[in-house]
From Swiss-Prot:
Name listed for the protein in its UniProt record: UPF0342 protein Athe_0692
HAMAP family given in the database record: UPF0342 (MF_01526)
Organism: Caldicellulosiruptor bescii (strain ATCC BAA-1888 / DSM 6725 / KCTC 15123 / Z-1320) (Anaerocellum thermophilum)
InterPro entries: Com_YlbF, YheA/YmcA-like_dom_sf
Annotated Gene3D superfamilies: YheA/YmcA-like (1.20.1500.10)
Family label: Belongs to the UPF0342 family.
Disulfide bonds: none
C-alpha cells in the first residue's frame, strides 16, 4: 500500500498543474506587481475576515455590515485584474474544499468543525 503522504504530494502536484491553479497564479502575479491593487484586496479581505469573526463569535452581523462588504466588493471588482484574481481564488478554494469533502466523506469523517456534518 502506498503512503498517504506520497499520495498527498501527488495530489498537490496535480493541483499545481491544473488550469485553475495556473489561472490563480497568473492573476496573483499581476496583483503582486501593483501595490495599490494589493492594498485594495488586503483591505477587502480584512473586512471580510472581521465580519466572519463577528459571526463566529455569535455577535450580530447586521444587514449594514453585509451591505458595506458587498459595496466594497462591487467597487474593487470594477478593476479587471482584481476581479480576475478574486474569481480565480474562489475557484481554487472551491476545488480544495471539494477535495477535502471527498476525503472526509469517503472515510466517514463528518465533523461539525469542518462543516461536513449531516443536517
Amino acid at each position: 500500500m502506498r503512503n498517504v503522504y506520497d499520495i498527498a504530494y501527488e495530489l498537490a502536484t496535480a493541483l499545481k498543474e491544473s488550469n485553475e491553479f495556473k489561472r490563480f497564479k497568473a492573476a496573483k502575479e499581476k496583483i503582486e506587481k501593483d501595490e495599490k491593487l494589493k492594498q485594495m484586496i488586503s483591505d477587502f479581505k480584512k473586512k471580510q475576515f472581521e465580519l466572519e469573526q463577528k459571526r463566529l463569535k455569535g455577535e450580530e452581523v447586521t444587514s449594514s455590515d453585509v451591505y458595506s462588504l458587498q459595496q466594497l466588493y462591487q467597487i474593487i471588482s470594477l478593476n479587471p485584474d482584481i476581479e480576475e484574481y478574486l474569481s480565480a481564488e474562489m475557484m481554487l478554494a472551491k476545488i480544495i474544499a471539494d477535495i477535502s469533502k471527498i476525503i472526509a466523506d469517503s472515510i466517514e469523517f463528518k465533523d461539525e468543525l469542518w462543516g461536513f456534518a449531516d443536517k
